């Protein structure tokens, strides 16, 4: 049997945008034990925790852009909600959710 032609593209999924209580951040440093330091768009540096559902499925490294949810009772800490891929970052820039300059500044 001949191979099927797979030229059709996968349906594009929606890029998660920050909702109330969430902020876009850039990973600054890996601390180990599933903890990282992130620099957020609101100007704060936080210690973030990678939840168990993301530990093996989503690999996070320094310089990645992530969506984080700061804790209500301890604002210097946060949980990682989502890691943006490069094409998703481009979509966020096109939709003017974030600017390229801010991301470059946070990445250092």
UniProtKB/Swiss-Prot annotation:
Report the residue ranges that make up the S1-like domain in this protein.
11-85
User: Would the keyword Cell membrane be found if you checked this record's keyword annotation?
Assistant: no
Q: Which cysteines are joined by disulfide bonds?
A: none
Give the molecular function GO annotations.
RNA binding; translation initiation factor activity
Q: Does the record carry Protein biosynthesis as a key word?
A: yes
UniProt keywords (A-Z) are: Initiation factor, Protein biosynthesis
Q: Which NCBIfam families match?
A: eIF-1A, PRK04012.1-1, PRK04012.1-3, PRK04012.1-5
Known role: Seems to be required for maximal rate of protein biosynthesis. Enhances ribosome dissociation into subunits and stabilizes the binding of the initiator Met-tRNA(I) to 40 S ribosomal subunits.
Checking HAMAP family in the record gives: aIF_1A
Q: What is this protein called?
A: Translation initiation factor 1A
Q: Which organism is it from?
A: Metallosphaera sedula (strain ATCC 51363 / DSM 5348 / JCM 9185 / NBRC 15509 / TH2)
| Upper classification of the organism | Archaea, Thermoproteota, Thermoprotei, Sulfolobales, Sulfolobaceae
């Amino acid at each position: 049997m001949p191979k099927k032609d797979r030229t059709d593209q996968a349906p594009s999924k929606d890029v998660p945008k920050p909702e109330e209580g969430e902020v876009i951040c850039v990973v600054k440093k890996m601390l180990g034990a599933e903890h990282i330091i992130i620099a957020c768009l609101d100007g704060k540096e936080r210690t973030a925790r990678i939840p168990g559902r993301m530990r093996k499925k989503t690999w996070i490294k320094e310089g990645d852009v992530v969506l984080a949810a700061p804790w209500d009772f301890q604002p210097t800490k946060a949980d990682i909600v989502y890691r943006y891929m490069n094409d998703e970052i481009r979509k966020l820039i096109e939709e003017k959710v974030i600017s390229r300059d801010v991301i470059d500044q946070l990445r250092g």
